[in-house]
Amino acid sequence: ELAAASATMPLVTDDDNLVVYDRNGNILPDEIIDPLDKILESLLDEIDEWVDAENDRSLASAIDAVNTGALNDELILWALTTFTEFDTGGAIEELSAAYFNADSAFRGADVILPAGFDAILEPLAANLDIRLGHVVEKISYDNSGIQITTSRGEFAGNFAVVTLPLGVLKQQVVAFDPELPTSFRNRVAKIPMGNVTKVALKFDEAFWDPAVQYFGYLSEIKGKWPYFLNYRAFADANILVALSFGAYPAEVERRPDAEIRAEVMDILRTMFGANATEPLQCLVTRWSADPYAYGAYSFTGTGVEPEDFDNLA
């Protein structure tokens, strides 16, 4: 509803609008790719019936238990990282087999707002007194009210709604006086933060099929740029967005932009050959190091239950 009410027209994404390449740059035929959804769904359904809270383990361990050898199948591994690790933000070696998909989804199709997702926020922010550039340093509270200390002054009020990202709470960069309850701090420590790294590459011309929404690549390392979003399918911009999932983002985000860019371009040249020209611009996300996030989003790791999320509210 918010997307529909925004000033820009939302465009629906289609996960089936996909072309997948093997690691040698060959396009895999539809008869190989199309059954992957059902294969993955069947595998995860089998795990759902087999695992519960009493015998929870990592998703990778559960997969190996119910289907020995599945993780050695490069197509199944690609589907797991591209869909499951992307959706959750966590590596299958860390995800809870019992609860990894216990979250709720909004109704309707997934959409992209070509003009930017701030089109959703702008009408919501209208008439609100929003102070930018005020980094919160300390929140003091008692029965008489609250006081918030920022990098540019202090604010007092009757109460505060604190929406700090879980990653920021885990880093303890904002002080609370008195400290938050021990039970709350334990839940913050218990729930892991995951990561998804994106590399946006802008080119002079599109050397790929502009009508294809997604490109897949069977990389030799799980999570190493297996998925590309073609922004040209949604807007008049020759942009490909490379995505990295699972454990790989934590490793790759420590490298300089030039090295990451070269690594992604090597894959694009494997996929598209000499037609893959050098990008005009390159933008690398580093959510794990962002001081206002410290991670992309949380996930249900082994030993974590849905109630742990509910009790953070």
Predicted regions and their residues:
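FAD-dinucleotide binding site
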Residues: 1-313
